[in-house]
Amino acid sequence: YEPNAIWSGEFQSAIWTSDPAWILYDLLINDRYGVGVPESTLDKYDFFAISKYCNEMVPDGKGGKERRFSCNILINSRDEVYNVIQQMTAIFRGIAYYGVGTLQLLQDKPTDPQYLLGPSNVVDGIFEYQGTSQKARHTVACVAWQSYDTLGDIEYEYVEDADAIAKYGIIKKDIKAIGCYSQGQAHRIGLWTLKSEQALTETCNFSVAIESG
């Protein structure tokens, strides 16, 4: 299929890919080395939308361009299905959960708001906010990735948020980038983690009635 075209839903002949969305899809439907989930229970258009975001070209940090998310991984041991799914979705900044009879996928990417909540459609109009701890607001990330230049040996990408360091000091977070053979992708993983933790510093609890949607 062509990621930048309107997709009819038909697949071409099976080929090798480093696209984490379709690697996950293959692991889910394959009954030999995967889960063996019926294709009819999966929304392949969700995978297609995630794949398009994964394949957008972004700066690689060396003057060139590369795909936003790529996955080069060898799975040679057994593990719980849930663990494998969560590890794979983490590659493209996603989560998976089971709902309405099928596996649902969500990805952290720019999108339109899905629902507007306010005091009028929240029980008693009450929102309860709680801030994250300072220890949870990391200022330095050390991302472990693998390099083709060293035949798959582990390399470490150091990423820091200078403004956050000036405010909180050094608070380090170690990250293992699964299936990552790109220094640029490793850097983006670290940067996204730091910026998210500095920007998303509150959780909000509230209750809604069934009629609120």
Predicted regions and their residues:
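Mixed-charge (acidic/basic) macromolecular-recognition segments
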Residues: 2-4
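C-terminal extracytoplasmic interaction modules
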Residues: 6, 13-213
